[in-house]
Amino acid sequence: MKTLLIFLAFLSSIFASLIGLTPPSKDSFYSPPVGFATAKPGDILKIRNTPSAPSSLYLPIVVKNAWQLLIRSEDSFGNPNAFVATLIQPLNANPSKLVSYQSWEDASHIDCSPSYGMQFKSPATTVTTQIDMTLIVPLLQNGYYVIIPDYEGPKSTFTVGRQSGKATLNSIRAALQTGAFSGIKKTAKVALWGYSGGSLATGWAISLQSKYAPELKENLIGAAVGGFATNITAVAEAVDGTVFSGFIPLALNGLANEYPDFKKRLYGEVKLSARSTMEKGSQNCLAASLVGYPMSQYFTGQNRAFEKGWGLLQDEVFNKTIEDNLLLKLDKTYLPQVPVLIYHGTIDEIIPIKDANAQYQIWCDRGIQSLEFAEDLSAGHLAETFTGAPAALSWIDARFSGKPAVNGCQRTIRSSNVLYPGISITIRIYFEGISKTIFGVNLGSGVNADKSISNKFFAYIRKYI
């Protein structure tokens, strides 16, 4: 199976170079029309069928329809912008059920956008989006329409909360307007789901919703967030100098793309010897950055990229920019008004569980109506992507079925989230196969297996990069 996938990916890359998809940076569809600023947030500016079929692990997905929508939105400061979202209609579509899926793009260049990377014939640079698409397939199999926003927006503002949250909400607004061609009812129920970088966008969306998109209250039925990113500083502390250090230049450039003063300070502080690496962080997609810059030190060690080390975070510009994008720092008026599931691996080596714990406690103390925390003792960040996905899907299915969510706050610690109640055998077998394909291990196979998953993941994506 692995050999077949690698061969198909190789063929798709060659095919793309000959016939290929036009990248967003060169595709006029991604540019808004003159006068677009007069449209309301959530209005659809352009519509087209996806240039190529959606695909997962470089294999085309059979669906009834797939469209790209250019949607009016706003940046963090309320300035008008426009972004693309992909709306997929499955063969057995239920017009009253829609899932907003926030992909873990985790990059700061528009050519890494999910709308591009999720298509058949997309380049190998977007291999992580092809992996992420494996989580969308079972949603489609269940008959749910799925909207996947390029929530980072036209500037690719990775880790910027308000931009991401607003775009997510505006993609839902837009999807609910498409009934004339998609069949989606304006009264459709909507669930949100995001893991890792996608959890950041999802978390901000449900936190902003009551103020920014109050009319969606009747549509939204819940949100599942996994590998929950609530504190980007803690992520930097966790990955600096590790095999995952490639996240840091991506995140810093994502912030720089939204905040000009931050960008000026960032490139003024980085050592000349590290400037090239930092600049490539604004050009590389996730896989290339992880493979290209493992073990790099930005804030620690004698050869760190920033002479001031962690002291740089005390700089006024750095501190304000980062504080503005910490979900943990939002006040009580941003309390989510929908049921929430948090699922997280205890030994998450990228997004420490302590900050998901902190967010859980904050929301509970503020009286959230329904919040469930499913902690997985045996999973790190990569493993929980697939160990936790069946739990998230089961939880979403329960919301669509009208089953009551937990009342108040409930925390459960399991040896593996594969043991989450209600997971169907079919879904478990599906994710078991994905886990074996990418990691070579069974779902929930224990801490010892998890320790080797990072190496297997890197080996997998190196075959594409």
Curated annotation (Swiss-Prot):
InterPro entries xref list: AB_hydrolase_fold, Lipase_secreted
Keyword Transferase: no
GO molecular function, one term: lipase activity
GO BP: lipid catabolic process
EC category name: hydrolase
Signal peptide: 1-16
PANTHER family: LIPASE 5, PTHR34853
Family designation: Belongs to the AB hydrolase superfamily. Lipase family. Class Lip subfamily.
Protein name from the UniProt record: Lipase 10
Gene source species: Candida albicans (strain SC5314 / ATCC MYA-2876)
Source species taxonomy: Eukaryota, Fungi, Dikarya, Ascomycota, Saccharomycotina
